[in-house]
């Protein structure tokens, strides 16, 4: 049994079951790069402030560098006998360079050490997520551009509502992801604060320089309250919430891909590379990837609830409960990263059944609103026009007709103002291109939206790369 670095206070060794129960190294070992990065920064600051000698600092930094290289090459395995990754690295450092390694923890607690490690991890994770959102947005915009002339029925209540451009529909998801990126950007801003120097909760008696450490680690600011610094998990909950909303948007798209690929809709075919078959039914081609995207949304929601419940009613400052924040955060990060990677590859491989979508665009009386608008332009109050067109739809249903099948004479029986000039209002192309309001489905507006999105994505890509 490895002796703990904090063993001095205790007469008896820790119960083995307690060691197993409290250990976190099996999941927090992914933080090793950040722990070493933070320790090197802390060590250099201690030397800069003359708290430890430059010779000792050089030895410590060299030892930490060796540990990092050995871990990266798989030559060093920090086993389950270690409590967590932070203590494991410190113990390995002392094994390598002796007692001088014990000077590293001067003016530092595991509380602010862990807080720093997780913030460093989250900075990288948020940037990675934003890059993947950007890639998915690019794919959606390209798909919208390639299918600019394709018409389809727009839906409300999953019933045919009005004809729209497929490109317009796809660009709706671009807007959702745009809001998601904004949330991740704002989360990054609140994550990007240095807590190191807060120590256990009250700060430290040593003359440290938090601003120096912040500059070294590229943090624009430091925390303002040491108690809050070691107990704050808001940024993780924000990440969980932003991720939940992102996955909610992904699940909506996934659901539509599942529906659209069904025999009943037959709007699309998903590439074989993203589907699986049945163990018993030879004909089946199942949209498993979108289904799992829809399903994995639930686990991200669950992780958010775990974080909220974990931090509910916790007294200040640090409590061991907070060890439990890592797994839901790591799982959420892994889930959204893998989901976005797949989604950005799946979308370009979709084959749209353009003719089928066009045929269905006019079904279900999708031009009824346009006929009502026609009557309004003839001077009929909208509510009356709405009622008249409702009667026409009723007539068509009884006679098994579509609106465009009706003659002028038939339509005139419902209102005398209807004439030959009604027919452009009963054509899908005209119905679409008349909707020129900002954000509308008219081709000109959708082209504008695509061009605007391209400019936004170029600017975002430059911002992320810098």
Curated annotation (Swiss-Prot):
Keywords, sorted A to Z: Amino-acid biosynthesis, Arginine biosynthesis, Cytoplasm, Lyase
Pathway field: Amino-acid biosynthesis; L-arginine biosynthesis; L-arginine from L-ornithine and carbamoyl phosphate: step 3/3
A Pfam family matched in the record: Lyase_1
Catalysed conversion reaction: 2-(N(omega)-L-arginino)succinate = fumarate + L-arginine
GO annotation terms (biological process): arginine biosynthetic process via ornithine; L-arginine biosynthetic process
GO molecular function list: argininosuccinate lyase activity
PROSITE patterns: FUMARATE_LYASES (PS00163)
UniProt-listed SUPFAM superfamilies: L-aspartase-like
Any GO CC annotation of this UniProt entry: cytosol
Compartments, record wording: Cytoplasm
Main location: cytoplasm
CDD domains assigned to the protein according to its UniProt record, in alphabetical order: Argininosuccinate_lyase
Source taxon at top rank: Bacteria
EC class (word): lyase
Record flagged with keyword Lyase: yes
EC number per UniProt: 4.3.2.1
PANTHER family to which the protein is assigned, alphabetical: ARGININOSUCCINATE LYASE
Family: Belongs to the lyase 1 family. Argininosuccinate lyase subfamily.
Protein name: Argininosuccinate lyase
Native organism: Syntrophobacter fumaroxidans (strain DSM 10017 / MPOB)
């Amino acid at each position: 049994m490895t002796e703990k670095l904090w063993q001095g206070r205790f007469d008896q060794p820790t119960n083995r079951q307690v060691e197993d129960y409290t250990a976190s190294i099996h999941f927090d070992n992914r933080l090793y790069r950040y722990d070493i990065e933070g320790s090197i920064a802390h060590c250099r600051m201690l030397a800069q402030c003359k708290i430890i000698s430059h010779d000792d600092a050089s030895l410590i930094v060299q030892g930490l560098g060796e540990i990092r290289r050995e871990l990266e090459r798989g030559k060093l395995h920090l086993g389950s006998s270690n409590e967590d990754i932070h203590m494991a690295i410190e113990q390995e450092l002392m094994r390598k360079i002796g007692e001088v390694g014990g000077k590293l923890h001067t003016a530092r607690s595991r509380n602010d050490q862990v807080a720093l490690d997780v913030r460093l991890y989250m900075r990288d994770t948020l940037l990675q997520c934003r890059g993947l959102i950007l890639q998915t947005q690019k794919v959606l915009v390209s798909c919208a551009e390639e299918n600019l002339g394709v018409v389809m029925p727009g839906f409300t209540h999953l019933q045919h509502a009005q004809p729209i451009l497929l490109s317009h529909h796809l660009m709706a998801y671009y807007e959702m992801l745009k809001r998601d990126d904004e949330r991740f950007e704002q989360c990054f801003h609140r994550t990007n604060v240095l807590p190191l120097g807060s120590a256990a909760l009250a700060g430290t008696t040593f003359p440290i320089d938090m601003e120096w450490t912040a500059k070294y680690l590229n943090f624009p600011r430091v925390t303002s309250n040491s108690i809050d610094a070691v107990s704050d998990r808001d940024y993780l909950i924000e990440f969980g919430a932003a991720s939940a909303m992102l996955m909610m948007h992904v699940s909506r798209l996934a659901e539509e891909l599942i529906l659209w690929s069904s025999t009943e809709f037959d709007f699309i075919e998903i590439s074989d590379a993203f589907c699986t078959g049945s163990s018993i039914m030879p004909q089946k081609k199942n949209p498993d990837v979108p289904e799992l995207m829809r399903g994995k949304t639930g686990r991200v929601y669950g992780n958010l609830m775990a974080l909220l419940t974990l931090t509910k009613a916790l007294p200040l400052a640090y409590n061991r409960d907070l060890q439990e924040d890592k797994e839901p955060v790591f799982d959420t990060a892994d889930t959204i990263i893998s989901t976005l990677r797949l989604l950005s590859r799946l979308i370009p491989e979709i084959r749209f059944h353009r003719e089928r979508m066009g045929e269905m665009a006019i079904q279900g009386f999708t031009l009824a609103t346009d006929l009502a608008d026609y009557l309004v332009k003839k001077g009929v109050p909208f509510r009356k026009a709405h009622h008249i067109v409702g009667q026409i739809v009723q007539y068509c249903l009884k006679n098994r007709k579509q609106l465009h099948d009706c003659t002028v004479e038939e339509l005139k029986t419902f209102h005398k103002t209807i004439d030959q000039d009604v027919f452009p209002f009963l054509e899908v192309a005209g119905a679409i291109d008349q909707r020129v309001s900002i954000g509308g489905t008219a081709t000109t507006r959708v082209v504008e939206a695509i061009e605007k999105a391209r400019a936004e994505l170029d600017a975002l890509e430059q911002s992320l790369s810098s």
